[in-house]
């Protein structure tokens, strides 16, 4: 956004943040978390929102001191170096197994109406079609994306309005056996997954250069928008887990509850207008932007320059195929939604920890900017705060990644090791290329 453009104010950022948080992921994750937490899903949503805000604290501190577009990747590079920056991108790529959740989520809702189709085949078809659409440059228009948000919000609002009167409130008594029927570990795994569903506001920081008073606006927006959406989500959780027996809805999508509370015409609107359309546009929209960070890394020399080249439609086709594979592999290997979600959220938490390490170095690398920031505190106080947040992030990542199957865990380990070795080998070339560019 150039200087001649109007900058984003507080209300603009609130709208952007709420739109980022309220996504179709809620359609996929709610049933999974009911399976993990039972009637504890409402409490899990509350704690998930709190966790989402807490893990944003390093982002908040960084944006208050050195607001910058590109946020996470930019902060890692500036505060931890080029190698760490590429490892951040590598972990981001791994976390995008979450692309498969949109395709599989779409398939689960679609097949609830058309059971004659196989879910894996429908999921792959959706992924192939959305990839093809992006390859020819037909990205979803802003109007379509806004329409998706409106339909999704309306569907979820109707879900709450029609569902609350039918909730069996006696079943929601807050006892330990009710909140953690499957034990503390499964409960906190659910909290970790829902923190991802409640996340999204931090991406406002990606527009740091284009926001009025970013050091004050961004932190307020992150906390307030997350809190507002959390209330909305808690009500959804109460309906999803309180209308039918938990055993019936555990690890299922929301169609079972929707059938119970809606007349037929509203049920069809909920499935198609809310779930199917939202998941498909989210999948398509994700594929339209997900290559940006990796393309930037390729242009810096981390990947062969050819991979950064765009086709005649302005799309980095080779890099798009990387993310197509990240979505296709979980579908073709039969990974279930819980496993995919745990892998994606667990590795996403690793990137959060890298941002925290960057924040740790902030007072030393940018002392003047830090002193002038709205959240300046004594260096020792900052480090104590980040230490406890770091423990929380590591714990969250652990509860997700510890549930991986042995093959999935081995695959992740090999990927990370290969990326680490590749970073060491490739760095001299990247450094030489940057020095050559500076000499010109």
Regions found by a protein language model. Name each.
Residues 1-31, 36-40, 52-53, 57, ...:
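Membrane-interface "cap" regions at the ends of multi-pass membrane proteins
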Residues 3, 42, 115-118, 146-268:
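Helix-loop-helix junctions that connect adjacent transmembrane segments
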Residues 6-17, 81-94, 125-126, 181-194, ...:
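Select transmembrane alpha-helical segments in multipass membrane proteins
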Residues 26-30, 102-106, 133-139, 246-247, ...:
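Transmembrane helix-loop junctions in multi-pass membrane proteins
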Residues 32-35, 44, 54-135, 271-296, ...:
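Hydrophobic transmembrane alpha-helices that form the core helical bundles
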Residues 74-76, 81, 112, 223-284, ...:
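TM-loop-TM module centered on a large, flexible mid-protein loop between adjacent transmembrane helices
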Residues 109, 119-169, 181-182, 222-227, ...:
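Membrane-interface loop-to-helix entry segments
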Residues 144, 306-317, 352-406, 429-440:
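C-terminal membrane-solvent junction of multi-pass transporters and transport-like membrane proteins
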């Amino acid at each position: 956004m150039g200087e001649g453009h109007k900058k984003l104010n507080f209300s603009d950022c609130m709208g952007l943040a709420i739109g980022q948080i309220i996504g179709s992921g809620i359609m996929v994750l709610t049933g999974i978390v009911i399976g993990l937490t039972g009637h504890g899903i409402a409490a899990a949503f509350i704690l998930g929102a709190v966790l989402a805000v807490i893990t944003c604290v390093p982002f908040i501190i960084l944006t208050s001191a050195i607001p910058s577009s590109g946020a996470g990747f930019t902060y890692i590079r500036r505060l931890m170096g080029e190698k760490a920056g590429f490892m951040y991108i590598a972990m981001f790529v791994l976390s995008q197994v979450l692309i498969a959740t949109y395709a599989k989520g779409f398939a689960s809702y679609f097949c609830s109406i058309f059971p004659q189709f196989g879910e894996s085949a429908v999921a792959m078809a959706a992924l192939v079609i959305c990839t093809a659409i992006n390859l020819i440059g037909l990205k979803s228009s802003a109007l379509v994306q806004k329409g998706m948000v409106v339909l999704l919000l309306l569907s979820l609002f109707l879900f709450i309005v029609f569902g609350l009167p039918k909730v069996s409130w006696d079943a929601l008594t807050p006892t330990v056996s009710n909140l953690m029927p499957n034990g503390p570990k499964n409960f906190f795994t659910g909290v970790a997954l829902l923190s991802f569903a409640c996340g999204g506001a931090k991406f406002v920081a990606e527009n740091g250069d284009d926001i009025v008073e970013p050091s004050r606006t961004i932190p307020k927006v992150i906390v307030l928008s997350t809190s507002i959406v959390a209330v909305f989500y808690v009500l959804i959780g109460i309906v999803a887990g309180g209308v039918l027996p938990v055993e019936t809805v555990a690890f299922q999508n929301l169609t079972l509850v929707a059938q119970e509370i809606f007349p037929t015409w509203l049920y069809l609107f909920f499935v198609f207008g809310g779930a199917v359309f939202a998941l498909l546009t989210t999948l398509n929209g994700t594929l339209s932007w997900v290559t940006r960070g990796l393309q930037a890394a390729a242009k810096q020399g981390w990947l062969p320059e050819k991979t950064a080249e765009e086709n005649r439609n302005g799309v980095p086709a080779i890099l798009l195929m990387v993310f197509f594979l990240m979505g296709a592999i979980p579908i073709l290997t039969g990974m279930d939604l819980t496993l995919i979600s745990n892998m994606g959220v667990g590795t996403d938490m690793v990137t959060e920890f890298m941002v925290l390490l960057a924040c740790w170095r902030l007072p030393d690398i940018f002392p003047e900017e830090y002193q002038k920031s709205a959240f300046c505190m004594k260096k020792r106080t900052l480090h104590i705060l980040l230490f406890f947040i770091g423990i929380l992030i590591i714990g969250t990542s652990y509860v997700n990644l510890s549930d991986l199957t042995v093959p999935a865990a081995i695959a992740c380990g090999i990927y990370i090791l290969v990326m680490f070795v590749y970073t060491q080998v490739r760095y001299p070339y990247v450094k030489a290329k940057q020095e050559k560019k500076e000499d010109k």
